[in-house]
Amino acid sequence: MTIYNINLGIGWASSGVEYAQAYRAQILRSLGMPAKFIFTNMFQSENLEHFTKNIGFEDNEIIWLYGYFTDVKISGTTYKKDDLEATFSQCPTKKEASSDRKLIRYYFENQELYINASLYGENQEYVQRVEYVVKGKLIRKDYYSYTKVFSEFYSPGENGVQLCNRSFYNEDGSIAYEEILSNEKSTFVFSNKICYGLEELLEFMLEDLSLTKSDLILLDRATGIGQVVFENIGAAKLAVVIHAEHFNEKNTDEHNILWNNYYEYQFTNADKVNAFITSTERQKILLEEQFTQYTSLHPKIVAIPVGSLDQLKFPEQSRKSFSMMTGSRLAIEKHIDWLIEGVALAQKRLPELTFDIYGEGGERRKLTELLTKLHAGEFIELKGHKQLDEIYQNYELYLTASTSEGFGLTLMEAVGSGLPIIGFDVPYGNQTFVCSGENGLLIERPKGDDRSRIVQAFADSIYEYFTKFKMADAQQYSYNIAENYKHEKLVERWKDFIEEMLND
């Protein structure tokens, strides 16, 4: 019996989907249930293991689609510079290191060749990627973990060089299979099989897993692969995990519903799904009502929170007065800019206010510029990516401007540290973790997302909280809500669900 969890990618700034999987991995470990987490994306800029280990997965829990067909194990990068240099057919005549020591360039007597090695590790002692450049043109890249994992080969193209081939290796250096790329299409060539495209490669892997009725597939992301998974699960049971708002409210009326395109295939083929999993009871009830109203299908839907709390966290010393925080990817849909402007406005009435923003992402530069523009750098700070477990409880208030959260892991963690919350009155996370007037405030989202009204509403709510709320009562209310999300309760819910699925 194995529980296979299927996803696409993962990165340093992981989304709630990956964090939900990491929480699930902890629970399945505690239940002693074998689990594998499958990632189907290609990883070039970073070793997949560094991403998965960073978020809490164990190496033996990970399956990488491209690595599945080799005997190279999921592992951190430990291939040494000395090992690389031992493969050179001639000694370098010169070495140059970049200022940050993350790149070393080797020059040889043959002036037409140089080699770039991207380094990894605290002392940059390991090699992660190597580029071979001849006559100023890239011809090959090699990627390493504890051994060479795969190589990419390049040929001249209209706009410089273009990737034309990949070779994936076994531990002994032999080629396990090759990927031929042409016109952005891939053909995977094995000794006994050819797969035309990524979908056929995934199909090949699913067939090789020899899934039985004792196996369970949990489909977390399905973009581009949903149909392949549905058609190749064999006798295994299939559950689809809903991580976000599942429909478009603006384009839904009493006769027609517009499903979220990420879930449309799954919902259209709900008769082939053993269960759908939402993270909140509110979303479960709504989805049940919508299936009844808009379709003839009545699938099984269960609500299981995507995260849990090992324990409630209490401050070792007094929380910093007038302190606020948020934690999320610095992505446009998180609307951190609204929070910054709202805090800057509120600070004019409450000069003691401070606001710390945890997370990384593509919006960092814009947010930095906004802080400069508002002259807010002294009381609002971008703190970068941090493990927040022991950080929440040092603050007095949590802010969120997300307009949709399927669950909101940081919201759960915030109430688990006694933090009241201010955010929009929107499904599903905010409405699950905040009782407006008790442990924070829910703000009505204005039509058209009127920026000035939103900023003013956040400023007014922050002022109201710090001047009118009894903080001790609000904090206790958050702790009371968090009790329902303690680890042992979630373990039982997963245990019951899995047993029901496999025994059905």
Swiss-Prot record:
Q: Where in the cell is it found?
A: Cytoplasm; Cell membrane
Q: What outcome is recorded for mutants in which this gene has been deleted?
A: No glycosylation of serine-rich fimbrial adhesin Fap1, an unglycosylated version of Fap1 accumulates that is larger than the wild-type protein. No further defect in a double gtfA/gtfB disruption mutant, but biofilm formation is further decreased than in a gtfB deletion.
Q: Which InterPro entries match?
A: Glyco_trans_1 (IPR001296), GtfA (IPR014267), GtfA_EBD (IPR054396)
- State the pathway, as annotated in the record: Protein modification; protein glycosylation
What is the membrane topology here?
A: Peripheral membrane protein
Quaternary state and interactors? Interacts with stabilizing protein GtfB (Gtf1), probably via the N-terminus of this protein; probably forms a heterotetramer with 2 subunits each of GtfA and GtfB. Part of the accessory SecA2/SecY2 protein translocation apparatus.
Q: What function is annotated for this protein?
A: Required for polymorphic O-glycosylation of serine-rich repeat protein Fap1. Catalyzes the first step in glycosylation by transferring N-acetylglucosamine from UDP-GlcNAc to serine residues in Fap1. Part of the accessory SecA2/SecY2 system specifically required to export Fap1, a serine-rich fimbrial adhesin encoded upstream in the same operon. The GtfA-GtfB (Gtf1-Gtf2 in this bacteria) complex adds GlcNAc from UDP-GlcNAc to Fap1, attaching the first sugar residue. Cannot use not UDP-Glc as substrate.
Supply the name of the protein.
UDP-N-acetylglucosamine--peptide N-acetylglucosaminyltransferase GtfA subunit
Q: Which gene encodes it?
A: gtfA
